[in-house]
Amino acid sequence: MVLTKLDKIKDEWARLAGEYDRQTTRGLLTPRAAAFCKRTIRNLIGSDPKDVLDVGTGTGLLAVEIAKAGHRVVGVDLTPEMLERARARSTGEGVEVTWLEGDAMSLPCETGRFDVTVSRHVLWTMPDPAKAFTEWVRVTKPNGRVVWFDSTWVKRSSTGSLLAWARETALARALRSTLRQKPKEHCCHYDTSLEGALPFRDLTSVRPIVELLRNLGISDVVFKSAQGAAPWNGILERLRSRERYYSAWFTVTPELHARLVGKAAQ
């Protein structure tokens, strides 16, 4: 059987559901990141109860936090193994979230259903980001909002990389010797062919995203630094990280909604 790109993505995240859950929980539930998350939910979604879709919900951490803030939440993910953990999380937290299995580029949701559509670290996994944004607009109400969280990567010159490596290595050896910690690897390792099929993987700038959105007729987009969401637990991780976290959003005007809904139907 020949696996499609979507099959490969699904299989990879199914394999990594447990490790992803541990890393996400560990990172986003630090006091600094948790406070940032609550503040961001209040600022970007509001305090009045709303219908919110969490696309690529994973193990449901963001969806559950949004539900705890009083919103009506639906979480969609491609991977049953992720959703199994998401259901356990919402049950454990005592909040109601509707969990659906589905593709972020072809959502199992009706048109104009949600006041806000959110995603966290999902955009880079999309083989077709334009199709994904078109879908996210489709399921959002006119005058609603599309919000996403992601990161870019800092380029390093060869000299800068060498210095950073030397500094990190010396500090890492000292700390690991003291704390007996093992090096942490990134939880997701796609094969080379799949990585090459993801246009927004390892971006060093948001410019390609801005250009894509402009081509879709979306120009009034707000990007804001979200370093408060960085899942750092101490100086070692802070030194090692090259990620620069950001939040972004735009309003789905009635004109934009009508045009992209028509495009999605073609």
What are these model-predicted stretches?
Residues 130-142:
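A short glycine-rich, Lys/Arg-flanked "PGG" loop and its adjoining helix->strand segment in the class I
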